Amino acid sequence: EKGLSFDETMVDLDNKENKLLNYGSICLSEKVPCLQINDNFTLFESLAITEFLENKFINNGFENIYPVDICGRAICCAIQSVVKTDFLQIKKEMPSITVFERQQHNPNWSTDLEKEINRLIRLAEFYIKEQWIAEKWSIADFDLSFMLNRLIQNQIVVPEKLMDYVERNWQRHSIQSWLAVRNSK
């Protein structure tokens, strides 16, 4: 989104590449993602990484990925945090891979999953204003749309407002570019 050039190295979590010594020597937490700048600075946790990039590359002609307005920024950070730390049943029964690859539809969702789906939909309907969470698009919009897309790709019916929101996010140039790179590997 900011138009920064970078190199991406894929880490195979299924094969626990993040637990191998070569990755652990770069990122002591063994967490993914990890941002490495030169050989002497690494940062893990996506929220910390996006906050760092926003603050380092602000007012230099780069697009903002968070609202400038302090209230809008706080709400976006809260949304990112809840998407990252909550909705564990959704993440368990509808893993990220289901967003990219069609999986066998499971009509027998757990009761806990149904509760989480309803809570996610309520949260999204409340915080998504006309188009975005804040006045303009932010990285929190993508994080929320990614979680909502888990539902959509698993054939969960969501309100049209949320379908449109997910579609708007996934049609952004930066997201389409990321998907193209991801699909080429």
Predicted regions and their residues:
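GST-like fold's C-terminal all-alpha helical module
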Residues: V83-Q171
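A local structural micro-motif
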Residues: D7, P159, S177-W178
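Conserved histidine-centered catalytic loops in small-molecule metabolism enzymes
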Residues: K185
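GST-like domain detector, emphasizing the conserved glutathione-binding G-site
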Residues: E1-P107
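Exported/periplasmic ABC-transporter solute-binding proteins
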Residues: V181-R182
